[in-house]
């Protein structure tokens, strides 16, 4: 029996599709990577009985990156990244072992059916899967077709079965367009980012950003936000005057009239008009009109409109809204959420989709009435040729989904029902009055038929007071006429919804990437999200955009990226050559990069005004080992130490607190040690600023603290404080934290394992002796007499933290947010876990602290 391998984009999709195609009769097991399951069943394929194996990937299998040495910022000129630096495809997540997993499942298979998402990224992943699987599949005989592509827009029985019955081929051109975009973004983004990050972080201490990134899409996105900020800053309010009149229609009722001139900017002229109208006692009716108008039902829903509404009405950021929509899609509640189309296909089953909502407690009455009276033909929208508009695929309740998932699903469903409803019809009445020489108007609206606003009440015509019945020549007494002084207002900061509209209009990003670009400028500290989800640029974001404008406006204007997007679309359509587009675009940006580097002084002048130089930033913390003067600690990201006398900057560990460590000095370079801590319940370790940046020994790497230093005799080093192999990771050593008392901690110097132990002990010391069972260093603990856990009022005990039954009761392991016993040999802590070499796979050395200090010294000095 032949075997058909089928691959979806996510594990949940694979399970849903397999259940539909197998009609529920399938067997499942976990794959070797633990993240993806394999679902097996028998059936027929190409007219013959076969065994189906349905599995998945977890998004992209591969990612594009530079070869090893080109990833070292200090050793490569960023200009080389445009052409000279070779790239390679690496596994997107090496921990998943996705390539090996696909090869294991694909070995010996005869056919492959690709169920990846039906967009350009999905096509690209198709070929990543094929690159892994085709070499291990059985060879085709006589030109037999073995590779198939399923195209679908929703996870419903009908759509999946139709896709299986109409298999096609993956689109190589669409995959190439994604390859081109990835390479362009990698080369251009890395070159500009590396240059400006190194240039400015070496000069200014309060940039508050660990990475000053540039992106071909990200930067124009930021440009829109800064452009609005500039308009606000340059806005000068103007005073204007308005006449407001009130007429009495009966004893208890009056009408407020709007001036036909709207406003004037000269007070004297406004005063003249006021004087002319103030004398009049009656307002004459000049004209009346009553017109029936309609408010159009919405177009079918596409991604951009969904993101706009999610931000403006639901308070959900674009990235979060997209993730929520993807979850609803994989669970089968909505159709594919990435689409540019706003027009339902001719064969779209509108009645069938509507019928699914007929019993919903919130909109059942509206749906039943539509089905009984006949649905209205949806408006003709734009057909982008990708996926149908976003629609609900099955009924769901608030209790079933909950939270943001329900709110987004509710909006999508209400929007769908509205597209097949009738327009909202209302009567607009207008009365024009003359008071002296001036004309005033009032208008009112009366709803005739709510139409689609019944299901989208927030779109309904606002209720207004009905106007009195009157005709030309009628007179009404004037209640009052007054002059109001007002001022013009500046525009507000862009909302996310407005930014999405601008990005779509100018062709910046795609429906899938727009949320990513907006999220990036927030994470890079270029903008902050204010109330009402408005995007306010930070000082750094403003200076960067102004700097780009000063040097080369095309770096921030949307025009050049829009042109690139058009070229990428031509690749996807097979109308442009991949290599030519790539080469031409890189050549353009390479020239721009060289000009940018030569003109960086222009941006630097703007930076000088907004940010402080390193020497003037920070507070004195620890002494430099070279000049013995105080170095300044710069807390803004990335935190670092700067010696203004030596003009040297030393990087520090991030995402924690830094403080002086007892004024102790490193025995190698005389720098004062500092202590890094992630909090009272997390890790902490001392480090020498110089050794952290310039490793003193061959087996040390940049960025290692004292807990990884192999100095044979320093009291802070791994040699003196190391205990034994980590209980979780393969390369780490558990090291005593000597600063943690009286709540003592032992932490791994590689992973985030922290063991809390010996609370309230006076002193904990790592002994030179080792355990006879596991070879870990013994700990000598001096307990508080009043709280000693030892029998017979003893206060001192030496033992192995892993094997000694006394110590086993006093140790608790913390790993990330979870808390569990450190010794897991059985249900209780007493049983131990059996350390030593048995746990480590063959060929892996067992890390432990060095024991023979003289041998270690000899190794370094020889």
Swiss-Prot record:
Q: Where is the composition biased (Basic residues)?
A: 821-851
- The name this protein goes by in its record: DNA topoisomerase 3-beta-1
* Coiled-coil stretches: none
Tissue specificity field: Isoform 1 is found in testis, heart and skeletal muscle. A 4 kb transcript which probably represents isoform 2 is found in thymus, kidney and pancreas.
Q: Which reaction does it catalyse?
A: ATP-independent breakage of single-stranded DNA, followed by passage and rejoining
The protein's UniProt keywords, in alphabetical order, are: DNA-binding, Isomerase, Topoisomerase
Cite the active-site annotation.
336
Q: Where is the Toprim domain?
A: 3-153
Organism in which the protein naturally occurs: Homo sapiens (Human)
Family matches, as InterPro entries: Topo_IA, Topo_IA_2, Topo_IA_AS, Topo_IA_cen, Topo_IA_cen_sub1, Topo_IA_cen_sub2, Topo_IA_cen_sub3, Topo_IA_core_domain
Gene Ontology MF, one: RNA topoisomerase activity
* Protein encoded by which gene: TOP3B
Query: PANTHER family this protein is in?
Result: DNA TOPOISOMERASE 3-BETA-1, PROKARYOTIC DNA TOPOISOMERASE
Please report which protein family the annotation says this sequence is part of.
Belongs to the type IA topoisomerase family.
**Which CDD domains does the protein's record reference?**
TOP1Ac, TOPRIM_TopoIA_TopoIII
One GO process term, biological-process aspect: chromosome segregation
Provide a GO CC annotation, any one.
DNA topoisomerase III-beta-TDRD3 complex
The taxonomic lineage of its organism, from the top, reads:
Eukaryota, Metazoa, Chordata, Craniata, Vertebrata
Region annotation (Disordered) ranges: 821-854
**What is the recorded function of this protein according to its Swiss-Prot or TrEMBL entry?**
Releases the supercoiling and torsional tension of DNA introduced during the DNA replication and transcription by transiently cleaving and rejoining one strand of the DNA duplex. Introduces a single-strand break via transesterification at a target site in duplex DNA. The scissile phosphodiester is attacked by the catalytic tyrosine of the enzyme, resulting in the formation of a DNA-(5'-phosphotyrosyl)-enzyme intermediate and the expulsion of a 3'-OH DNA strand. The free DNA strand than undergoes passage around the unbroken strand thus removing DNA supercoils.
SMART domains on file: TOP1Ac, TOP1Bc, TOPRIM
Q: Which residues form the Topo IA-type catalytic domain?
A: 171-593
């Amino acid at each position: 029996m032949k075997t058909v391998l089928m691959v979806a984009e996510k594990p949940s999709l694979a399970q849903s599709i397999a259940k539909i195609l197998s009609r529920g009769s399938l067997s499942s097991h976990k794959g070797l990577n633990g993240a993806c399951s394999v679902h097996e069943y028998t059936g027929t394929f190409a007219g013959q009985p076969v065994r189906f194996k349905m599995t998945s990937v977890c998004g992209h299998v591969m990612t594009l990156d530079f070869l090893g040495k080109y990833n070292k910022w200090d050793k490569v000129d960023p200009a080389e990244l445009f052409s000279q630096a070779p790239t390679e495809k690496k596994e997107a997540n090496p921990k998943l072992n996705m390539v090996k997993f696909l090869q294991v499942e694909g070995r010996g298979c005869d056919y492959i059916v690709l169920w990846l998402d039906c967009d350009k990224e999905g096509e690209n992943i198709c070929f990543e899967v094929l690159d892994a699987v085709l070499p291990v599949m059985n060879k085709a005989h006589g030109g037999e077709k073995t590779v198939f592509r399923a195209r679908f827009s929703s996870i419903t029985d009908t759509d999946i079965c139709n896709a299986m019955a109409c298999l096609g081929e993956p689109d190589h051109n669409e995959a190439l367009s994604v390859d081109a975009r990835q390479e362009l973004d990698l080369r251009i983004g890395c070159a500009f980012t590396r240059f400006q990050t190194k240039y400015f972080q070496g000069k200014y201490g309060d940039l508050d950003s660990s990475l000053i990134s540039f992106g071909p899409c990200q930067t124009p996105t930021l440009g829109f936000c800064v452009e609005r900020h500039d308009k606000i800053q340059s806005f000068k309010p103007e005073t204007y005057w308005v006449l407001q009149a009130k007429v009495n229609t009966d004893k208890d009722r009056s009408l407020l009239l709007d001036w036909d001139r709207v406003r004037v900017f000269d007070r004297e002229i406004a005063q003249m008009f006021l004087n002319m109208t103030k004398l009049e006692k009656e307002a004459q009716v000049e004209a009346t009109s009553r017109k029936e108008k309609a408010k159009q039902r919405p177009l079918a829903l596409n991604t951009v409109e969904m993101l706009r509404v999610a931000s403006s009405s639901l308070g959900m950021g674009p990235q979060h809204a997209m993730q929520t929509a993807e979850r609803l899609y994989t669970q089968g509640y909505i159709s594919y959420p990435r689409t540019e189309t706003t027009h339902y296909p001719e064969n779209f089953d509108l009645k069938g989709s509507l019928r699914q909502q007929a019993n919903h407690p919130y909109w059942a009455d509206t749906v039943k009435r539509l089905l009984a009276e006949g649905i209205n033909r949806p408006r003709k929208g734009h057909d982008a040729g990708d996926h149908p508009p976003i629609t609900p695929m099955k009924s769901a309740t608030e209790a079933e989904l909950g939270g943001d998932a329900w709110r987004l699903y509710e909006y999508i469903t209400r929007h769908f029902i509205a597209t097949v409803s009738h327009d909202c019809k209302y009567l607009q009445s207008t009365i024009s009055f003359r008071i002296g020489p001036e004309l005033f108007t009032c208008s009112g609206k009366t709803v005739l038929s709510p139409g689609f606003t019944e299901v989208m009440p927030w779109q309904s015509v606002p209720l207004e007071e009905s106007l009195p019945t009157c005709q030309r020549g009628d007179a009404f007494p004037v209640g009052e006429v007054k002059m109001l002084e007002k001022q013009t207002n500046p525009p507000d900061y862009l909302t996310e919804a407005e930014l999405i509209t601008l990005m779509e209009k100018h062709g910046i990003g795609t429906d899938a990437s727009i949320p990513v670009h907006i999220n990036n400028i927030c994470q890079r500290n270029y903008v902050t999200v204010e109330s009402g989800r408005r995007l306010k640029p930070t000082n750094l974001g403003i200076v960067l955009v102004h700097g780009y404008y000063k040097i080369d406006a095309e770096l921030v204007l949307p025009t050049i990226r829009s042109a690139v997007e058009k070229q990428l679309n031509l690749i996807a359509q097979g109308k442009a050559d991949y290599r030519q587009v790539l080469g031409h675009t890189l050549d353009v940006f390479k020239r721009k990069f060289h000009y940018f580097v030569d003109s960086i002084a222009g941006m630097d002048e703007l930076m000088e005004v907004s940010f402080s130089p390193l020497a003037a930033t920070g507070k004195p913390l620890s002494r430099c080992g070279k000049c013995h003067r105080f170095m300044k600690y710069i807390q803004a990201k990335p935190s670092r130490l700067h010696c203004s006398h030596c003009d040297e900057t030393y990087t520090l560990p991030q995402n924690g607190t830094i403080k002086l460590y007892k004024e102790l000095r490193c025995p190698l370079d005389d720098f004062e040690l500092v202590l890094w801590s992630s909090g009272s319940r997390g890790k902490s370790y001392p480090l020498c600023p110089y050794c952290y940046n310039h490793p003193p020994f061959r087996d040390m790497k940049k960025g290692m603290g004292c807990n990884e230093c192999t100095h044979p005799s320093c009291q802070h080093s791994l040699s003196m404080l190391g205990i034994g192999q980590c209980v979780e990771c393969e390369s780490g050593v558990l090291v005593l934290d000597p600063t943690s008392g009286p709540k003592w901690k032992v932490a791994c110097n590689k992973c985030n394992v922290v063991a809390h132990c010996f609370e309230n002990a006076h002193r904990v010391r790592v002994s030179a002796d080792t355990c006879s069972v596991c070879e870990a260093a013994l700990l000598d603990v001096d307990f508080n007499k009043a709280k000693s856990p030892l029998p017979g009022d003893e206060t001192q005990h030496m033992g192995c933290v892993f094997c000694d039954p006394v110590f086993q009761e006093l140790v608790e392991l913390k790993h990330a947010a979870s808390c569990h016993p450190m010794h897991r040999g059985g249900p209780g802590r007493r049983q131990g876990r059996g350390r030593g070499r048995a746990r480590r796979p063959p060929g892996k050395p067992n890390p432990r602290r060095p024991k023979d200090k003289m041998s270690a010294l000899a190794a370094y000095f020889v």
